[in-house]
């Protein structure tokens, strides 16, 4: 069986474990048509554009 050569220090263990609990940041890009914040590679919910194309009409 595989056995670790050396004991992992408490500092190293806690440092590795802390990454699990870190809050994830959401990537946000700007719509080229209206300038509203939107998720990347998705249709803008404010104006209905994806890139330079109108994908759907937004009900106002």
UniProtKB/Swiss-Prot annotation:
One of its GO terms (biological process) is translation. One of its GO terms (molecular function) is structural constituent of ribosome. Keywords: Ribonucleoprotein, Ribosomal protein. GO terms for cellular component: large ribosomal subunit. The keyword Hydrolase does not apply. It comes from the Bacteria. NCBIfam families: rpmF_bact (TIGR01031). Belongs to the bacterial ribosomal protein bL32 family. PANTHER family: 50S RIBOSOMAL PROTEIN L32 (PTHR35534), LARGE RIBOSOMAL SUBUNIT PROTEIN BL32 (PTHR35534:SF1). This is Large ribosomal subunit protein bL32. The lineage of its organism: Bacteria, Thermotogati, Thermotogota, Thermotogae, Thermotogales.
């Amino acid at each position: 069986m595989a056995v670790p050569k050396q004991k992992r220090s408490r500092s190293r263990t806690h440092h590795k474990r802390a990454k699990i609990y870190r809050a994830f940041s959401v990537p946000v890009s700007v719509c080229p048509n209206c300038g509203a914040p939107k998720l990347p590679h998705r249709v803008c919910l404010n104006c209905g554009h994806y890139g330079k194309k109108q994908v759907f009409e937004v009900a106002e």
